Amino acid sequence: MAIERTFSIIKPNAVAKNVIGNIFARFEAAGFKIVGTKMLHLTVEQARGFYAEHDGKPFFDGLVEFMTSGPIVVSVLEGENAVQRHRDLLGATNPANALAGTLRADYADSLTENGTHGSDSVESAAREIAYFFGEGEVCPRTR
């Protein structure tokens, strides 16, 4: 299986619950290497840009408001089949449908405040990583 990179966000509601370390531990226990991470507070412009594909949808303004309501943690995870395995660990987007033991089952509050984000394809992962990480901010892992 090919080594992939995927993009992850720990959203404001999960950051506020002080579960960043718990989530990172679950990433590592699942076999992911954390090759880039940082905490930031999105501006409205950054949030609108990141979620531009949803502009015009009924939930867009609420999503932007939520994503700018507090700090987030963005990370790049590396591993075999990383995109799909990360999405499996996150659970269903709607936490009401998330299986027990997934991050959204454990840390989500609602459909919008679902605790985490994960790329849905290798292509979107590359785009999302480039949105938040510049040259030299993601480390190569050799071990």
From Swiss-Prot:
InterPro entries: NDK-like_dom (IPR034907), NDK-like_dom_sf (IPR036850), Nucleoside_diP_kinase (IPR001564), Nucleoside_diP_kinase_AS (IPR023005). It comes from the Bacteria. Transmembrane segments: none annotated. It is an enzyme of class 2 (transferase). Its main location: cytoplasm. The active site is at residue 117. One of its GO terms (molecular function) is metal ion binding. One of its GO terms (cellular component) is cytosol. ATP binds at residues 11, 59, 87, 93, 104, 114. It is found in: Cytoplasm. Keywords: ATP-binding, Cytoplasm, Kinase, Magnesium, Metal-binding, Nucleotide metabolism, Nucleotide-binding, Phosphoprotein, Transferase. The keyword ATP-binding applies. The keyword Hydrolase does not apply. PROSITE patterns: NDPK (PS00469), NDPK_LIKE (PS51374). The modification Phosphoserine is found at residues 119, 121. GO terms for biological process: CTP biosynthetic process; GTP biosynthetic process; purine nucleotide metabolic process; pyrimidine nucleotide metabolic process; UTP biosynthetic process. Gene3D superfamilies: Nucleoside diphosphate kinase-like domain. Changing residue 121 to A: Still autophosphorylates. No change in kinase activity. It catalyses: a 2'-deoxyribonucleoside 5'-diphosphate + ATP = a 2'-deoxyribonucleoside 5'-triphosphate + ADP; a ribonucleoside 5'-diphosphate + ATP = a ribonucleoside 5'-triphosphate + ADP. Its EC number is 2.7.4.6. Homotetramer. Major role in the synthesis of nucleoside triphosphates other than ATP. The ATP gamma phosphate is transferred to the NDP beta phosphate via a ping-pong mechanism, using a phosphorylated active-site intermediate. Belongs to the NDK family. This is Nucleoside diphosphate kinase. It comes from Escherichia coli (strain K12).
